[in-house]
């Protein structure tokens, strides 16, 4: 199931989710962790990743919390229809950036000046497509959940000269890391 939302709806939705747990900083940390990692919740209130259940103790340990906080957060998610629908359908996607070099791919990390600005992905992809470079994966960190949002692009081939300079010259770009 795919849900297409306007940018303003997405920002509002994320804000609403975080706001829903504003009365509990510990549960808010759990929700943020679930969203950052693409983890969901099963019908019976267990944390899952693509249908594979994960022990609440493992999640709690990862965020420096307690299993009971994780369980209470999952229960609270299931009690609210909008949250229930989101977390029952959440899916994680593999990020191959850490193994890209072993696979012979090139990784470009773009740090934006302002991650909320539109057109960052399009501008970078345009530069790459102008050089007929094949993109294997694009991974964008959501600025609503990350203190250091970034655009990670994985290419099949090595970079020809001049490409990095063109990406660095884009007005949205603060830094490029290879």
What do these predicted regions represent?
Residues 56:
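Helix-turn-helix DNA-binding elements, focusing on the entry/boundary residues of the two helices
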Residues 1-12:
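Short, intrinsically disordered or compositionally biased N-terminal tails of bacterial proteins
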Residues 59-60:
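Short alpha-helical "recognition helix" segments of helix-turn-helix
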Residues 14-46, 76-178:
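A conserved regulatory-domain signal marking ACT and ACT-like small-molecule sensing domains
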């Amino acid at each position: 199931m795919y849900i297409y939302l306007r940018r303003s709806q997405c920002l509002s939705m994320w804000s609403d989710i975080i706001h829903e747990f504003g009365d509990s900083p510990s549960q808010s940390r759990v929700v943020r962790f679930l969203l950052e990692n693409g983890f969901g919740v099963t019908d019976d209130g267990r944390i899952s990743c693509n249908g594979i259940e994960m022990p609440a103790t493992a999640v709690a340990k990862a965020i420096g919390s307690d299993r009971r906080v994780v369980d209470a957060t999952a229960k609270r998610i299931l009690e609210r229809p909008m949250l229930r629908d989101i977390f029952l359908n959440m899916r994680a996607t593999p990020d191959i950036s850490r193994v890209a070099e072993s696979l012979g791919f090139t990784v470009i990390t773009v740090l934006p000046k302002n991650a909320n600005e539109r057109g960052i992905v399009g501008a970078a992809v345009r530069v790459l497509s102008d050089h007929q470079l094949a993109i294997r994966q694009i991974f964008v960190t959501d600025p609503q959940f990350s203190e250091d949002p970034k655009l990670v692009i994985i290419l099949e081939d090595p970079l020809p000269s001049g490409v990095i300079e063109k990406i660095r010259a884009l007005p949205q770009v603060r830094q490029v890391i290879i």
